[in-house]
Amino acid sequence: MTAPSQVLKIRRPDDWHLHLRDGDMLKTVVPYTSEIYGRAIVMPNLAPPVTTVEAAVAYRQRILHAVPAGHDFTPLMTCYLTDSLDPNELERGFNEGVFTAAKLYPANATTNSSHGVTSVDAIMPVLERMEKIGMPLLVHGEVTHADIDIFDREARFIESVMEPLRQRLTALKVVFEHITTKDAADYVRDGNERLAATITPQHLMFNRNHMLVGGVRPHLYCLPILKRNIHQQALRELVASGFNRVFLGTDSAPHARHRKESSCGCAGCFNAPTALGSYATVFEEMNALQHFEAFCSVNGPQFYGLPVNDTFIELVREEHQVAESIALTDDTLVPFLAGETVRWSVKQ
């Protein structure tokens, strides 16, 4: 006789950091998000990046065309900041409801970020405009200097970029995305109400040992890179505390299998199919399920000044095996936790 399964009912969540790509990949991955989440902040790092209102409107339409009938999903678009971006274009997009936020990628920090910002000073007029109109700034918080160790790039970013920026523009709303270190967890926790953070499932579940000991696991390779276990533990403690300025952002970032399993593999975990159950597992392990709904469904809208979703979903606690792969037109996509047995999943 099997034990009765446990059901967890929560307000429909949102994903505050998501990569959907474009073309066939977009069509493949969108349904994995749209069946679960009400909204998602969509990253603009296409090639070429989304830097105009027209490009964002067109991209939003391509996303909506990929949403299956019966899914109620709203993509929230972002503008990719560049050294040459016109502040008026950004403000127009924000006022017209096209841009929800703008994304700062330090040049060459991650996938398709070669057009990114060379220095904060180069975009100060844009940032000043964002502060004035109340537009959130989303930050990939890593320095990219060649002499800075990859495991130190987030901590160094806080002291050399993030803190000086926030001291200069004190009213600017900032989301420190996909934080991975104790340094960042402490910084956000000790900050004011204009600073928030997202955390991915992989950074809560794993540390660099899981990626590197006993063989390299390319499907755990993402940026910012997994850190040592003391940092993982700090992130877990932050979410388990019920802190209300940290929220769900999967950073789901699909790449075809041959681009991950390569002599020079791409960074990114495609976790959209398994992320919500992964978060539930972490909260359960931390005896913090009472804070799970707020992390998934309340804290993000609260920071962005948006209403919470008015529908609900259920997760069920019963073991099931994650698919080994998902078909693409001419390759496959390997989901986060592929082939593994997981405890929680969204009830269909």
Swiss-Prot record:
<feature type="binding site">
    <location>
        <position position="223"/>
    </location>
    <ligand>
        <name>substrate</name>
    </ligand>
</feature>
<feature type="modified residue" description="N6-carboxylysine">
    <location>
        <position position="103"/>
    </location>
</feature>
<feature type="binding site">
    <location>
        <position position="251"/>
    </location>
    <ligand>
        <name>Zn(2+) 1</name>
    </ligand>
</feature>
<keyword id="KW-0378">Hydrolase</keyword>
<feature type="binding site">
    <location>
        <position position="178"/>
    </location>
    <ligand>
        <name>Zn(2+) 2</name>
    </ligand>
</feature>
<dbReference type="GO" id="GO:0008270">
    <property type="term" value="F:zinc ion binding"/>
</dbReference>
<dbReference type="GO" id="GO:0006207">
    <property type="term" value="P:'de novo' pyrimidine nucleobase biosynthetic process"/>
</dbReference>
<dbReference type="GO" id="GO:0005829">
    <property type="term" value="C:cytosol"/>
</dbReference>
<feature type="binding site">
    <location>
        <position position="19"/>
    </location>
    <ligand>
        <name>Zn(2+) 1</name>
    </ligand>
</feature>
<comment type="subunit">
    <text>Homodimer.</text>
</comment>
<comment type="function">
    <text>Catalyzes the reversible cyclization of carbamoyl aspartate to dihydroorotate.</text>
</comment>
<feature type="binding site">
    <location>
        <position position="255"/>
    </location>
    <ligand>
        <name>substrate</name>
    </ligand>
</feature>
<feature type="binding site">
    <location>
        <position position="140"/>
    </location>
    <ligand>
        <name>Zn(2+) 2</name>
    </ligand>
</feature>
<feature type="binding site">
    <location>
        <position position="140"/>
    </location>
    <ligand>
        <name>substrate</name>
    </ligand>
</feature>
<keyword id="KW-0665">Pyrimidine biosynthesis</keyword>
<dbReference type="GO" id="GO:0004151">
    <property type="term" value="F:dihydroorotase activity"/>
</dbReference>
<dbReference type="InterPro" id="IPR002195">
    <property type="entry name" value="Dihydroorotase_CS"/>
</dbReference>
<feature type="binding site">
    <location>
        <position position="45"/>
    </location>
    <ligand>
        <name>substrate</name>
    </ligand>
</feature>
<feature type="binding site">
    <location>
        <begin position="19"/>
        <end position="21"/>
    </location>
    <ligand>
        <name>substrate</name>
    </ligand>
</feature>
<protein>
    <recommendedName>
        <fullName>Dihydroorotase</fullName>
        <ecNumber>3.5.2.3</ecNumber>
    </recommendedName>
</protein>
<comment type="similarity">
    <text>Belongs to the metallo-dependent hydrolases superfamily. DHOase family. Class II DHOase subfamily.</text>
</comment>
<feature type="active site">
    <location>
        <position position="251"/>
    </location>
</feature>
<comment type="pathway">
    <text>Pyrimidine metabolism; UMP biosynthesis via de novo pathway; (S)-dihydroorotate from bicarbonate: step 3/3.</text>
</comment>
<dbReference type="InterPro" id="IPR032466">
    <property type="entry name" value="Metal_Hydrolase"/>
</dbReference>
<dbReference type="Pfam" id="PF01979">
    <property type="entry name" value="Amidohydro_1"/>
</dbReference>
<feature type="binding site">
    <location>
        <position position="267"/>
    </location>
    <ligand>
        <name>substrate</name>
    </ligand>
</feature>
<feature type="binding site">
    <location>
        <position position="17"/>
    </location>
    <ligand>
        <name>Zn(2+) 1</name>
    </ligand>
</feature>
<dbReference type="GO" id="GO:0044205">
    <property type="term" value="P:'de novo' UMP biosynthetic process"/>
</dbReference>
<keyword id="KW-0862">Zinc</keyword>
<dbReference type="InterPro" id="IPR006680">
    <property type="entry name" value="Amidohydro-rel"/>
</dbReference>
<feature type="binding site" description="via carbamate group">
    <location>
        <position position="103"/>
    </location>
    <ligand>
        <name>Zn(2+) 1</name>
    </ligand>
</feature>
<dbReference type="InterPro" id="IPR004721">
    <property type="entry name" value="DHOdimr"/>
</dbReference>
<feature type="binding site" description="via carbamate group">
    <location>
        <position position="103"/>
    </location>
    <ligand>
        <name>Zn(2+) 2</name>
    </ligand>
</feature>
<keyword id="KW-0479">Metal-binding</keyword>
